Regions:
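Beta-sandwich/jelly-roll carbohydrate-recognition scaffolds of carbohydrate-active enzymes
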Residues: 2-200
Length: 200
């Protein structure tokens, strides 16, 4: 029997010095707990294939051509080749400048640095040659896959959607997905999108 779980060495590791996530070589976020690393998982497919994931990759391709961290950073860069073109995906957990200089933090036990976690997973896509059909599936599963998520559009168009827990929504974080493309939302189904990336 073929093991549905990739080797742990195949996962990319991202961190914003407050949180972490693991991304499989197939372009899927398979471990992320929010808002803290000791919170229940939102994406947990590394442990259970039905426990939530967030995949962003070319349609019909599951093995990238190359993968690396940009030098001196925790920005993961994945290069994909298809029969119609080349695509580069860059991913990072974002840090921003320290935002509150007037009051002490209620979440930090140590004196804060100049930078702080923004709690944003940023995934950028750039088509460098030809045209590539891209697929995105975002299927969170709150509380280690014990609570389903429901999606709804939260912006004026189709580029922003929010996922909330179906039961006891206040006890779980809300996830906001923003894209420059159009996302398909169907309440209890995952957010999906297939777009053709234009030429460079």
């Amino acid at each position: 029997l073929r093991n549905p779980f990739p080797p742990i060495a195949d996962y990319g590791f991202l961190s914003d010095c407050e949180n972490t996530c693991l991304i499989s070589s197939s372009g899927s976020v398979e471990w992320l707990c929010v808002p803290r690393p000791d919170s229940p998982s939102v994406f947990g497919a590394i442990l259970d294939r039905g426990a939530g994931h967030f995949r962003l990759a070319p349609y019909g391709v599951s093995v990238p051509s190359a993968r690396r961290y940009l030098p001196g950073s925790l920005i993961l860069e994945t290069t994909w080749q298809t029969h119609t073109g080349w695509l580069i995906v860059r991913e990072a957990l974002v840090m921003g400048p320290w935002h509150d200089l007037e009051a002490r933090s209620r979440t930090h036990r140590r004196t804060p640095m100049d930078w702080d976690a923004e709690h944003i997973l940023l995934r950028t896509v750039r088509c460098v040659s030809g045209t590539v059909e891209l697929t995105m599936t975002c299927q969170p599963a709150f509380d280690y896959h014990r609570v389903r998520a429901a999606w709804e559009y939260s912006g004026p168009a189709y580029g922003e959607a929010t996922a909330r827990a179906v039961t006891d929504a206040d006890a779980h974080p809300a996830l906001r997905l923003t894209t420059s493309g159009r996302s398909g939302v169907s309440s209890l189904l995952p957010v999906t999108s297939r777009v053709a990336s234009a030429s460079p």
